[in-house]
Amino acid sequence: MLRCLISRPQLLPTRLPLATPSCVSRRTFLGFTGGDTKEQRYILKRVFNAPLHYVYPAVSEVSLYKLFIPYCTDSFVNKRRPGDNMPTEAGLRVGFQQYDETFVCRVDCTTLPGNQRSVVAESLAHHLFETLHTQWLLSPHPTRPDASVVELILRFKFKSQLYNSVSSIFGTRVTQVVMKAFEKRVFQLRKEAMDRPPTGDAGH
């Protein structure tokens, strides 16, 4: 779902994945072409101490990214799928100092065999990126019913050589920061659910 994924002028250690393009910037370096720079690829896998029914909503609901992803100043959903209300087009606005970028992506949220979930975000515009692909693969932990395996796959190439150079330095760190932000978000959602008073006749 989400062309979520994650995100701004990719030049600071904290925002890359879930995101999509549609650039509105106070300052950019799009005049510097990307040359022969290769597409960058990052893969990160973690175990979250929460079942999928907490993880999947955190990843798929792009409109709430602004609440927990560093430097994400806005997040929104333009289109949703009839029936389950999952996002099909979403975006992020990321700002840091004089940089301000907005990204819009096509989002695809699907259920896979083995009770897995997939959230894929692909860029819709190409004035900032040559390519941008973000995928979250969410799986039940094979031996721990109360845990999930979360894998983030990120592929991108900027049109700006400067952005490509800077992101090649910070890419690994950015991916880790994004993953950590989602882990904290899932922990928060689970804690809120556990702290919520039971419904029904519990007070009688």
From Swiss-Prot:
GO terms for cellular component: mitochondrial inner membrane; mitochondrion. This is Coenzyme Q-binding protein COQ10, mitochondrial. Interacts with coenzyme Q. Required for the function of coenzyme Q in the respiratory chain. May serve as a chaperone or may be involved in the transport of Q6 from its site of synthesis to the catalytic sites of the respiratory complexes. Keywords: Membrane, Mitochondrion, Mitochondrion inner membrane, Transit peptide. Coiled coil: none annotated. It is a peripheral membrane protein. It comes from the Eukaryota. GO terms for molecular function: molecular carrier activity; ubiquinone binding. GO terms for biological process: cellular respiration; ubiquinone biosynthetic process. Pfam families: Polyketide_cyc (PF03364). Belongs to the COQ10 family. Residues 1-24 form a transit peptide. It is found in: Mitochondrion inner membrane. The keyword NADP does not apply.
